[in-house]
């Protein structure tokens, strides 16, 4: 099975190892992975800020970049969720509506692809540590991915998995929301940080890197010793003793 990696901006620039882990996981389950170098931003920041025409330029480039891909898989529910919005955005456009539908139909977040497409719920991973999971808003509400990440985490040998209280509450990031509404955002992430502390987890795991930056930043400012990691880092671990 051939899969094209949608790296996403934050993974490309900030969380470079997430791309590596994603590729290694896909290869472990028998996928042949390529990287279309012409890909760019999915257009979400511009779109959410009201710059529709500017956003469409990025979206058209993405459609062209992945035109020949069999499957498109990315390590972000938010960014993949944006690809799923393309058919709505290009609805009625004689040149771009069908290509937008084609891209949306073959695009998946990594855990969604593993569980729902490949039927993989156990990667044979080993990880020792107390872990809690934050389900991001876009992952759950836009993309509809709720069970797949936890199924995979709970299959990891040696893991001590604990549910996050009121787990589906927003962390306050929301892309440009945290910039436009900083006071509200700060209170939301403060509450999320408290919920993480209540679990006594050593690791906070998530599938969207914007959320991880936001929550991790808050916990560091509070002096909390909780490691914040992307789910692919846990799933691609084959040793006991956690992450250094």
Curated annotation (Swiss-Prot):
GO biological process: lactate metabolic process
Top-rank lineage group of the source organism: Bacteria
Record-level GO cellular component terms: cytosol
One Pfam family linked to the record: CCG
InterPro entries per record: Cys_rich_dom, LutA
Disulphides: none
One MF term in the entry's GO annotations: oxidoreductase activity
Function noted in UniProt: Is involved in L-lactate degradation and allows cells to grow with lactate as the sole carbon source.
Family: Belongs to the LutA/YkgE family.
Name this protein carries in UniProt: Lactate utilization protein A
Organism expressing this protein natively: Oceanobacillus iheyensis (strain DSM 14371 / CIP 107618 / JCM 11309 / KCTC 3954 / HTE831)
């Amino acid at each position: 099975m051939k899969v094209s990696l949608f790296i996403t901006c934050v993974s490309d620039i900030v969380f470079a190892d997430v791309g590596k882990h994603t590729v290694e996981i896909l290869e472990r389950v028998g996928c042949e992975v390529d990287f279309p170098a012409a890909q760019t931003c999915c257009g979400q920041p511009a779109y959410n800020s009201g710059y529709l025409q500017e956003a469409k330029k990025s979206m058209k480039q993405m459609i062209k970049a992945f035109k020949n891909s069999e499957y498109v898989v990315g390590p972000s529910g938010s960014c993949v969720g944006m690809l799923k919005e393309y058919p709505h955005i290009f609805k009625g456009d004689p040149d771009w509506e069908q290509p937008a539908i084609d891209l949306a139909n073959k695009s998946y977040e990594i855990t969604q692809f593993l569980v729902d497409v490949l039927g993989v719920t156990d990667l044979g991973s080993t990880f020792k540590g107390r872990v809690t999971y934050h389900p991001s808003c876009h992952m759950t509400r836009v993309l509809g991915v709720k069970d797949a990440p936890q199924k995979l985490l709970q299959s990891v040998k040696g893991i001590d998995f604990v549910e996050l209280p009121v787990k589906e509450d927003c962390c306050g990031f929301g892309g440009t929301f945290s910039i436009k509404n900083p006071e509200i955002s700060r209170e939301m992430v403060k509450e999320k940080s408290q919920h993480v502390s209540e679990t006594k987890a050593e690791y906070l795991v998530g599938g969207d890197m914007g959320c991880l930056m936001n929550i991790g930043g808050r916990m560091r400012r509070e002096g909390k010793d909780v490691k914040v990691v992307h789910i692919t880092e846990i799933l691609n671990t084959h040793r006991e003793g956690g992450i250094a």
